[in-house]
Curated annotation (Swiss-Prot):
This is Arginine-containing cyclodipeptide synthase eshA. It is an enzyme of class 6 (ligase). The conserved DDXXE motif is essential for catalytic activity. Keywords: Ligase. Arginine-containing cyclodipeptide synthase; part of the cluster that mediates the biosynthesis of a highly modified cyclo-arginine-leucine dipeptide (cRW). Within the pathway, eshA acts as the scaffold-generating enzyme and is responsible for formation of the cyclo-Arg-Leu diketopiperazine (cRL) from L-arginyl-tRNA(Arg) + L-Leucyl-tRNA(Leu). Additional enzymes from the cluster then further modify the cyclo-Arg-Leu diketopiperazine (cRW) scaffold. It catalyses: L-arginyl-tRNA(Arg) + L-leucyl-tRNA(Leu) = cyclo(L-arginyl-L-leucyl) + tRNA(Arg) + tRNA(Leu) + 2 H(+). Belongs to the arginine-containing cyclodipeptide synthase family. GO terms for molecular function: ligase activity.
Amino acid sequence: MSIPTDIANLLIGEDAKLSIHFDKIPLHNDAHHSGSKFYMLSTNRALRDHEEKEDDLKYLSKGRQGAIRLNQLLNAPHLIKERESTAQNEGKAVMRLGETAMVIDETFDAQPIHSHIWNSFMSIEFRFPQADFTSLQYLQTSWKGLESGDTLYTKEGTPTFEEVSIVSGVCLFNARLLEMSTTCPKSGGVDVDLLKSSTPTYNELDYIARASSAIADVAAMNILRACEQDSGQRLTIKLDIPSWHYFHTVATKFVSKQCSNTEVLQWMDAVDQRHDQIGQTFVEAIRYGLEQRGIHDSTSYGIGMTSRTNTAAILIRTAIEHEEVPSLDAILAALDSEEDGCWKRFYEMIPVKERPSNLDQLGYLYYVYEAIRPSLAERPAPVPLESDQTKKANLSKKALKKRKPRRLIISVDDSAERRIYSRAQRVLSKIRQCSEKPETYLVESYVCRRFLVNGNEDRARLGRLDPLPDIPVRTGFHHEPMLPLDVVRQLYGNKSALNLQRWLQEAGLSV
């Protein structure tokens, strides 16, 4: 295990020249950070100075508390701090707080960057002794509803939650490629070849490399806890890979008669193909990460990605095939009548003023839906014995509430997606108030960025300013292009880059 010391910095000059520089992450422990938009803190030293620098450390302490609660959740009840070393000697996986915090400016206000909880990412060590593997993550954790003492299993070894799911996702292409492909300068229509010929972007590969290891850490801890308790509980990992969410762009072009329905359908095919290729690569990266951590039994977990042929996608395609305009009302009605009833239950929780008025807004709301979908699925409840029914009749409402099934969703994502999960938390709060629905809780975990734009001066996101199809050079080496895999190699290691290259080629993507 090595502490990351580099951040990739995409420099976009006034003359539109592009270069990538690898910056060493500065270590600061004073109150003045010279305007730096990213740096590292030694948390032990900083927390000792808490009284002298209370404003500086108020949110650092809150961030640390979030990490402590994640520690309590994932570690077994008996693995309290004093016995972590004993647990490791026994071969049990253990999560420990590290000694540093990464501070990356994520906010859009004038406050100093060290005075906002959104900016602090705590170092966390995941140790898997049986696999002789240790991983270091910089995570930021948000909670709502769960009690501080909640763990995956009780001291008696009973699962606290009837279901545990991990959710994540990755954006396809980048904003520039998607925009260029729908504004072809030659025809004014769409440029399908631009999408088809696009190599994997900086944003796609950086995120998969960054998030897959964090997902594997959290997932492996869950799986190993289930094995220790012999609970038979199977972890579910769901990756939300967009597809039809992007279709509104070309649908608008078709409505304005700037392209034919054939071109639109070909553009949709290119997006769907990318959905499959990037999704397959992401799945393989997580599987490999689990194997590194000693998880070789694939029956202990299920991993999959969202479908690109759901109701909304089919209706949009069908309308375009018949040279018609996709109808939002028709799509909503079809979603509402789906057999499993999940969307119907979800949509009932959305205030009328927050409901979508176009396909773009529907696509965004669908991200929220997928994030909490595990809470919406209905499971057949076991029929209680007659004696149990008698006991249940005598229980108080408070006691009944405690006996409700509980489900846990852990998100592992980029902090750029925070709005999705914040909105998901609001819906889950409503669901928990319904007596007939399981109590579902969402633990938000955000992985720290390692690829910044212009020193993070404007907090710009790589997904929006990813330079492809243009290729930057390495700063100071004007004839050395820095391809996406080159950046992965520099930030995450040669093995990570080689594995990604192999999985991408197996998925049919040229790199």
